[in-house]
Amino acid sequence: IELLQTFINKAKQIKQDSKSEALLQALDKSFEMQAKEGASRKALIFTESTKTQAYLKEYLEANGYEGKIVLFNGRGSDPKTTQIYKNWYEANPSKVSGIKSADRRMALVDYFRESADIMIATEAAGEGLNLQFCSLVVNYDLPWNPQRIEQRIGRCHRYGQKHDVVVVNFVNIRNYADVRVFNILLSLIHI
């Protein structure tokens, strides 16, 4: 227990989150490049957990992206998502399928297309979404399965995409597990 408490205390002393800072820099630079290319200012950020998703939303909102973010996960029960769905449902009666989960997905995609710059998603968005209006995919966390990377990229790299899809992969080079996963993915699918 003493050892665990030592780790907890060390974690609390961390004042700088270099990975999130790097994400912020990557977004700013990528949005600049998108503007030069005439592409929409859109980014799809994938993460493995809803806790990281919530943290990234909070961090990005505190650093210039307030009101420009939509979350996509398997739950979809946060107040903003519920409000997005309610507004979409009332404004788009002809699009309503009657299948609530499908309608929620459509509402979030429409909101991302029309109102948000950034969608932060878990693997729930890895399949079945058409986001060809977005040309930036950020893999904040890398999954072990190369097929999941291809599915993530495939959300934006679809028929109707008018711009090259840029993929940013985050790898902590000081973390052996991250480097190992990246090297495996690199050898299998050349990301």
Q: How would you name each of these model-derived features?
A:
Residues I1-A116:
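Conserved Helicase C-terminal RecA-like lobe
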Residues T50-K51, I118-A124, W144:
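Conserved helicase core region in the C-terminal RecA-like lobe
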Residues Y55-L56, N130, R148:
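Phosphate- and divalent-cation-binding pockets in alpha/beta enzyme and binding domains
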